[in-house]
Structure formats: C-alpha cells, structure tokens
Amino acid sequence: MRLIFSLLLLVGCTVQAAEPVQSFTDDLGRVVNVPLHPQRIVSLHDLDITIPLIELGVPPVASHGRTRPDGSHFLRSGVLLTGVDFDNSNMTYIGTADIDIEAIVAAKPDLIITEPSRNTPIEQLEKIAPTVSIDHLDGGAPEIYRKLAQLTGTQNRLALLERRYREEIAQLKRTVDTQHISVAVIQANQGKINALHTYHSLGRVLRDAGFTFPKIIDSIPPGGRIDVSAERLPELDADFVFATWRGDTGGKPQDEIAAMDAVMPGWCEFLTACQRGYYVLLSREEAISNSYASLSLMVAQVQTHIVGRWLPEAK
C-alpha cells in the first residue's frame, strides 16, 4: 500500500508540473488548480460525467461503468446515446460501486472528475491528479455541462448543442399548445410512487416546453423528489402521465406496469390519463441521462405522443 501511495504522489506531481493550469471552484467549495487543456480525464460516473464529456468531444481515458451478468462492462446508456462504450474505444473501466485505485493510476490522468456521492475519498484521488467534484443535483444538466465545458475548454461545442436543443424546444412549442396541457412523470418505487420536481432529461424537456404540472409536483423543491403513498395517486393525475422502464438490465415495459400493480391494484382506474390511454411508457436509459442526445430523443418522444391526441375542453 505504501508503494501505491508513493506512486500516486509521484504521478500527481509529474502531471501538475507538465501543463499550464486554471483555477476551478468545485461543488465542494474547493479551489483546485487543473490543467488548462486536460488530455487524460478519468470520470467517476458514467451517466453524469462520462456521457457529457463524450458529447463535448473530450472522452475520458478511463471511466466508472456497470457490469453485466456475463462479466462484461458497459457505460449505462453509452451506446444508445453516443455510440461509445468500453468495447469500441480506448476507455478503461475502473469499477462500479468500488473504484479500482490502481486502474486510475495506470490511466495516468491529468484530471479526475468525481461526484460528492462517490464513496472513493477525494483525499485519495487528489494524490493521483488534480480532482474536482461536480454535484449533479446542483443545477442539474445545464450546470454539469457548463462546468465540464469550462474544465475542458469546449464552450463552443456546448453552445452548438444548446442552440440545437433550444430550436427543438421552440418547434415543440409551435406544434403543441403546451401551456394548456398538464403532464406528470411517476415511477413505482418500493411500494410507493416516486415523483421528482424535474425528472432528468424528460422532466427538463417538459418544463422547458412550458407544460403544466400537478400542484404536488410543483411543490417539490427544484432538484428534489418525494415518495407518494398509493392513496394520493389521484393527486398525480394529469392530461398525460409519463413513466419509465429500465431496459439495460433486461427489463421490459411490463415490469413498470407490474410494479404499479404492486403499489396499488387497479391503479389505472384512479388516473384519467391512464383510462384515456395517455399513460406513456418511455425507456429509462433515454429519459434519465444528462445528455443532449437524450434531450433530443425526449423532445421527439413527447411531441409524437401528444400531437393529435384529443383532450377534453378545459373547465
């Protein structure tokens, strides 16, 4: 172990001496001197950090990922949203829940990007290379991308991604009378129903487009979530109710319906959206990623499911 930490210190000092630096204040309030143009980034979260870095044109040399039952590794939503994964890139897998410190050292990073929720101590990581912590709950995807673009000097690329997204939202608003349509996003979760103020990319699209939400959802603080008991399900009703199902572990849309049945048998009778056929199931891998590819998919999905559907006149 002493040998490993000696190597960490040696590598860290070498990297910091090699490049001009900029000062960056991370979400833990730490001021960190980071390379002005990092070339060897290690990411400690696939959805929140790795996929955005790929979209910004600076894929990490090593990343957190997931493990399939057969032992192979993958980036959650990686291929679906970017076409990139461990098996078709030079990216090294460094672990899932438990991060392999030696694998990080072997990647020779000049910058490590982690999150406050990661269980690998930041004090350990910063001995390897300059380390910053970005909180995905602090401002959501827009802030994640802004910070990553600042760290990597890719503000121009981010501006192009943002402009395309804004045009997609404008087109959705031209097509759909969003201000007069209510929406909700729900998810069965351990015997209760989970609702977020803004459900990741899907929720951001719905809010940016100007749809209205049930009061119970609007009362959730931005970035927050609540568990709702079965008897309060009618409070989550809307013109359209969206839900998601997880497919990267072999799940099917029917699994989410079964999970709702377990929360409340006959639940569909308590949602007018469900009775009308306006309960919409979407792929969770597409809906939860902090990526512009995900936002584009969600705009298309929302527009497709809502355009042309009959709704009763507002009372």
Locations of regions flagged by a protein language model:
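N-terminal signal peptide c-region/cleavage motif recognized by signal peptidases
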Residues: G12-T14
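Charged, glycine-enriched surface loops/patches
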Residues: H64, I122-A159, R166, K252-L281
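Extracytoplasmic ligand-binding site segments that recognize negatively charged/polar headgroups
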Residues: R68-H73, D135-K147, S182-V205, D248-D255, ...
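Basic- and aromatic-lined ligand-binding clefts that recognize polyanionic substrates
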Residues: R40-L44, D48-L53, L160-I216
